[in-house]
Amino acid sequence: MKNNYTSLKSPLDEEDELKTDHEIDLEKGLLPEYNSEEEGALPPYSDISKLAKTVPEDSSTGPTETANPNVERRQGFKDSHPNIYSLLRLLISVLAVSVVFFTAWVCVNPLEKSIFGKVAFSVTIGITCPILFIAIFCFFETWTQAVAQCIKVTAIFLAQCVKACGKGIKHFLKKWENMPMAFSEVFLFNILVGSPRMNLRYIFGDRWGLKCSLAEHITFVVLSILVFIAETVKPGSIRVNLIRKMGYEAKQQVNEYTAVPLREMNPESEA
């Protein structure tokens, strides 16, 4: 049976195919194997694959930026309700100026001052309040964003503090068996330190300014709490440190009193 197949290609076409089969594109490298069974697969280096991979970009708009939802919400409210937004700015500005004015009035009380004091107060308030009103009204969006950012940072900081305190309390509660001893030590601390403190306050209170002092009570309460926490977490830490400190100071005093001068030990050194 004879093969009647006749090639329709000219000898020049066959020669070009042989050349292109053996030539390698230095930029693209070797051609990868093409698997026609894969869905959506395209021949390598084909124009169709280039068109499929190309993503159209809008040169007029440029890259899109991630907008802040709070800014968009504020801008939308400003565009939809311009009168209410302006009234809100005016109300907040007047409220802030009023707070500053009445605070300064209560603190300074210009009615009890001399004429010079009244004039100085009037000039200061007359300059400060308009400047404050203009700054708050004109830069309303700027300082509101700054205040919101400060509130956000403060909230994050407080959340971290609460988390750290929770871990500390959890570790503290693990030492619950030390709490009765720590409480008794705090009670003893209040007896030993509280009685002399009360006597000194009643005797020398007018001279030292210790009578009915709020700072004194707060300091004493804080010290008691610190003693309770330290003795609960590490029992005996305060007692050991206090005894060591007292022993070290007593040893230094003994060394100072019993030290023999160098001249008395070596009288020949004077000659």
Swiss-Prot record:
Entry protein name: Meiotic drive suppressor wtf35
Keyword Zinc: no
Biological process (GO), any one: meiotic drive
Species of provenance: Schizosaccharomyces kambucha
Cross-referenced InterPro entries: WTF
Bilayer-crossing regions: 90-110, 120-140, 176-196, 213-233
Keyword field: Membrane, Transmembrane, Transmembrane helix, Vacuole
Assembly notes: Homomer. Interacts with other proteins that exhibit high sequence similarity.
Function, in words: Acts as a suppressor component of the dual wtf meiotic drive system, and can suppress but not confer meiotic drive by compatible poisons. Wtf meiotic drive systems promote unequal transmission of alleles from the parental zygote to progeny spores by encoding a poison and an antidote from the same locus; the poison is trans-acting and forms toxic aggregates in all spores within an ascus, wherease the antidote is spore-specific and targets aggregates for degradation by the vacuole.
The keyword Transmembrane is assigned to this record: yes
UniProt subcellular location: Spore membrane; Vacuole membrane
